[in-house]
Amino acid sequence: MKKLLIYLYFSCCTVLLCAQNPESAFQFLQLPVSSHAASLGGDNISILEDDPELSYHNPALLTNVSSHLLNFSYMNYLQQTNVLGAGYTAAVGERSMLGVKAHYLDFGKMKNTDAEGNIIGDFTAKDILLMGTYSFDFSDHFAGGVSSKLIYSNYGQVYSLALGIDLGINYYNPDYMLSASLVARNLGRQVKTYDEIQEPLPFNLLAGISKDLAHAPVRLSLTLTDLHKWQAEDFYNRGDNSWSSILLRHIIIGADIFPTSNTYLSMGYNFRLHSELKNTTKRTFEGFSAGIGLEMSRIKIGISYGKYHVAASSLMMNFAIML
């Protein structure tokens, strides 16, 4: 309990000191990495699964993952952007886990123009993330975790380097089949700026809860995002600035259905994505996502699909194997 109180105190102090404005660099850090989390509305910090990619969303969840899992991920994002990832997990003693992962984003070739708009050539853009995660079971109900990040972006002739950390805590009560989490994501700063102007990382404070139903193979999830700011400056306003509209933009909901003990079907809805990217002329499915997962003795597979706009979507696949 003493370790837990120290961890909570450090987490709260760090959040209060490092809350940052939304005009931040390295926006790729907000993309989902777990196909399961992506299928539940694009983010989830409270489901407990043997899925190493979930530790990207909440480092405390790594304590639920098996040791010696080698995992790979791929996402096609908005058609021309490809995201590749790989990671590995290992137990450290009886109550702690260590994980490492790397992610590479390739935006492809783009036209390079001068100040007058004349095309003068092509340039490439890429982002790279190296991350290490440590998680620890404080007790039978509480787990905490921390992730350290080395972040690199290169766009044409300019590049930037940053250091960041994520802090997470999870509470689980098996009697009520209830899991609750709190995460402070992307604390840190640039160590090499693009043009000598310091830009913050995309800080996010999240809370989440997941509950298994007692008499049905269903789990419901609620995730709250951007809790450190009520109305973010980057909320795109379509004219509805009411209290209820702003509240909904902080909410992500999701549901898992378990047809068998080793499969899941999931779906989610992101209110903010729907509000800001919806087609105003016809009813479409912006903000909706869905996925499927299969777990065998040594192999785990997950696939998700998310709709962001009438002309843009994402497809993500995770694969893990026990060595």
Which residues make up each language-model segment?
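Bacterial Sec-dependent N-terminal signal peptides
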Residues: 1-23, 255, 323
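Subset of outer-membrane beta-barrel
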Residues: 20-323
